[in-house]
Amino acid sequence: MRILVISDTHGELGNFLKVMDIEKKVDLCVHLGDIEGQENEIADLVSCPLFAVRGNNDFFSPLPYDIDVKIGPYQAFLTHGHHYGISVGEGGVLEEARARGANLVMFGHTHRPVLREEEGIILVNPGSISYPRQEDRKPSYMIITINERNGKAEFEQKFLKS
């Protein structure tokens, strides 16, 4: 199973189209907020199930703020992160993930990639493919590949070339 994880597209589809051209087929797409009204367009472009959460710029969106979902061997907690103080640190999302029984938390909002494990919980932020804020400012996303036979997952942070 190949999972595309993106966040903070902010209504800009140009780099998303580049990502889809590179990645071709994915089995699941996760959008972690600030989709700005383009959930239908993105769902049509990926031609697979889409889990999308509401970000701080999705003012009138019907999307949920959080999703709890089983993805492969993981109990995943999906959120934009702004309700959990992600701008000042990851403590709030970690605490919420623990409370929900999650061993994988995916979040956005900061526009900076994160991939690490703390206290048995994997933290994933794909960064932003539209407005990256990390030092090199390369648009970023993540591909998670789950081996269907043994359940092992490979997390790959990817960057678009300028």
Give names to the regions the model predicted.
Residues 5-7, 28-33, 51-56, 78-80, ...:
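Active-site neighborhood of phospho(di)ester-bond hydrolases with catalytic His/Asp-centered motifs
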Residues 17, 72, 95-101, 124-162:
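Binuclear metal-dependent phosphoesterase catalytic core
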Residues 42, 66-70, 96-97, 113-115, ...:
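Short secondary-structure boundary/capping segments
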Residues 1-49, 58-65, 137-140, 144-149:
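N-terminal active-site segment of His-dependent metallophosphoesterases
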Residues 10-14, 35-40, 57-62, 84-88, ...:
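Active-site environment of divalent metal-dependent phosphoester hydrolases
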Residues 80, 84-117, 123, 129, ...:
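Catalytic core of the metallo-beta-lactamase
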Residues 51-101:
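Helix-adjacent hinge/juxtasegments
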Residues 47-50, 120-122:
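Glycine-enriched alpha-helix->loop->beta-strand junction motifs that scaffold or abut catalytic
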